[in-house]
Amino acid sequence: MSGLDGGNKLPLAQTGGLAAPDHASGDPDRDQCQGLREETEATQVMANTGGGSLETVAEGGASQDPVDCGPALRVPVAGSRGGAATKAGQEDAPPSTKGLEAASAAEAADSSQKNGCQLGEPRGPAGQKALEACGAGGLGSQMIPGKKAKEVTTKKRAISAAVEKEGEAGAAMEEKKVVQKEKKVAGGVKEETRPRAPKINNCMDSLEAIDQELSNVNAQADRAFLQLERKFGRMRRLHMQRRSFIIQNIPGFWVTAFRNHPQLSPMISGQDEDMLRYMINLEVEELKHPRAGCKFKFIFQGNPYFRNEGLVKEYERRSSGRVVSLSTPIRWHRGQDPQAHIHRNREGNTIPSFFNWFSDHSLLEFDRIAEIIKGELWPNPLQYYLMGEGPRRGIRGPPRQPVESARSFRFQSG
């Protein structure tokens, strides 16, 4: 009996030793399954030899198919032949069972981890019974959905992280593109603004060069004009001398021309007309420079009004640009001074004497007299002389204008 009891205790000790198998050599699952199978067979033989029945002492143990390789621990208990031994075995069984339970849990966890399964810690007897009821395959099949969920969650997190990274990378790329575009635009603006100053300088230089060329051309034109003026002035002078010689033989030619001029006629009174009847010649002479001024010379016969044979009115342009007028004083016979008489024109309006033009340099209308004589009457006096006899003489067309229009000197008193 004692030997049988000792034989019953040996497998427990061996089983406790098998709880922590050596995983270094061979397949731990296969070795574990083989050891458990041999232990179970030895326990059954010993129970049959003792004439007792086997009872399960450890509540957490469960038999499994060797293929599943789950932990299966069974403790033999003696029957009626060894009551004391049975009690002793029952008293000794709880500590051994606790060791076996821990070994079984460690074995199951190790086997499940190697097979790709995840096991939680057994909590109390209910957890141990669940481990007994289910094999390694059952535990694996129950834990697979949790693993898949964890893998799916991990994949989702990885995908979301990748999406976030891609979004950040895309935002960074867009920001870089915007910065590059701004830099390009700023660079283009700088490139446009940098050469602008040289371009403006070049344009200004070109304009200054053109202005200088125009000034040179104008100076050449002035010199050429002076040369032509002098050349054709000499030619005109010959014709003017011949014209003056002919006019002197026509009595009252100039007084008729003055009286027929539409702008000069209102400035001539009856007494002025009588004095102009003694006028035999009119000369208009430009100074050395045509723009410097001109000189008017009235030639008279002896008359009862004044002693002068010629009356001169000269307009001269000073260096300041101001035009001044100079004239010859008129030596009047006693009582013939125009200031002593009231002068009226043909319309009966009171007017100053035309001869005041030689002495008074303040009236603007006297400056107008100089412009009319120089620009209209002197170039072609014949058309004004014939204006009163137009229908009889058969004058055709408008009066002939001079080749060069007269220049206005803005005659002012000096």
From Swiss-Prot:
Compositional bias segments (type: Low complexity): 101-112
Source organism superkingdom: Eukaryota
Gene Ontology biological-process annotations: nucleosome assembly
GO CC aspect terms: chromatin; nucleus
Ranges of Basic and acidic residues composition bias in the record: 24-40
TM stretches of this protein: none
Pfam hit, one: NAP
UniProt xrefs under InterPro entries: NAP-like_sf, NAP_family
Molecular-function annotations in GO: chromatin binding; histone binding
Stretch list, region Disordered: 1-129, 391-414
Protein family (similarity comment): Belongs to the nucleosome assembly protein (NAP) family.
Protein name: Testis-specific Y-encoded-like protein 4
Organism: Homo sapiens (Human)
Gene name for this UniProt entry: TSPYL4
